Amino acid sequence: MITLQEAISIAKKWNDKFNAYQEYKDAYQFYVDDGATHDGGGYSCVIEKESGKLLRWEKYFMDLEREIVQVGEPIRI
């Protein structure tokens, strides 16, 4: 199980422009919130909490076997 700080570090290595995240039951989604859009043109990634594995957002959200449960509201970092 990774911590939020570890997840932020992994995400920033992939794209240092990430400035917001949304927590889900089993993952964190990181993205660019530029005030107009919440993805900054499609730049988003998901990091699984259990494994620390970095996924493209499509792989996480399009997985019909996965139960997507949002935790709280989006947060800027």
Language model segments and positions:
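Long, contiguous N-terminal structural blocks used for assembly/anchoring
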Residues: 1, 76-77
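Short, non-transmembrane alpha-helical segments in secretory-pathway proteins
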Residues: 1-17
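A short, surface-exposed interaction/processing loop segment used at functional sites
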Residues: 50-76
